[in-house]
C-alpha cells in the first residue's frame, strides 16, 4: 500500500493520469455530438440533454461497480456508511453540477460560459484551503490560480467579444454549477480517505444518473430515436466517464486538491452540453 501511495503522489504519475483524464474527456465531445444526432436530441432541448446525461452516468456507475466487484472478487454494493458519503457527493457533483450547467449554458454565450466554467478548479482550491482547511494556501497556489484562470479567459476571448451582462438563470446557474463542482472535489478528497474511491465513484454516479434522468423526464425530456448506434454511443460515453472520473477520484484520494486541480482542466460538464 505504501508503494502504491508513493507512486500516486509522484508529480509525474499524477500528471500522466491527469493527461489520460483530459484525453478521455476530450474524446467525448465529438462523440456526444454524434449521439445527439443519432438519438435525435436537439441542441436547444435542455431536458432531453439531461435525460441523455442521466442515462450515461447511471450506466457509468453500474460499470464502475461491476469493475470493482470483479477486482475484489465479490459483489461491491454500497453499505450504509458509504451511502452517507456518496449522497452529498452525488448531489454536488452529478446532480447539482450538471443540472445547473445544462440550464445555464442554454441562456448565456459560449464565451461567458467557458470563462465561468474555468473557475471550477480554482473554487475547489479556495474551498479546500480557506473553508475546509485541508491544506495551506501558499503564494505558489495563488499564482497558479491567477495564471490558470487568466489562460482560460484568454483562450475563450480569442476572436470573440465579451459583454458584461449577468443573468441568474444563465451565468448565475453556471456559477452555481462550478460551486457544486468545487464542493464535490473537496468532498471526494475527504471521503476517499475513509471509503474506497472506486466504489464511492460508482455509487454516486448511479444515484446521480437516476436522479438526473428522472429530472429530465419530469421536464418532458426524451430520446427521440433509440437505435443500436445511439446505444453504442451511450455505452462508450459511460465507459469514458467511468474510467476518467474514477481515476480522478483516486488522484484526489492520495493528493491535495490544489495539486490535482492545478495539473489538469476541470472535468466540466461542458463536454455534455456541446452540440
Predicted regions and their residues:
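Loop-to-transmembrane alpha-helix entry segments
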Residues: 114-117, 133-154, 164-170, 227-231, ...
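Transmembrane alpha-helical segments that form core, pore/gating elements
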Residues: 22, 33, 61-64, 124-126, ...
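Transmembrane alpha-helices of multi-pass small-molecule transport proteins
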Residues: 38-93, 123-127, 180-184, 201-219
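Juxtamembrane C-cap of transmembrane helices in multi-pass membrane transport proteins
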Residues: 24-45, 59, 98-108, 116, ...
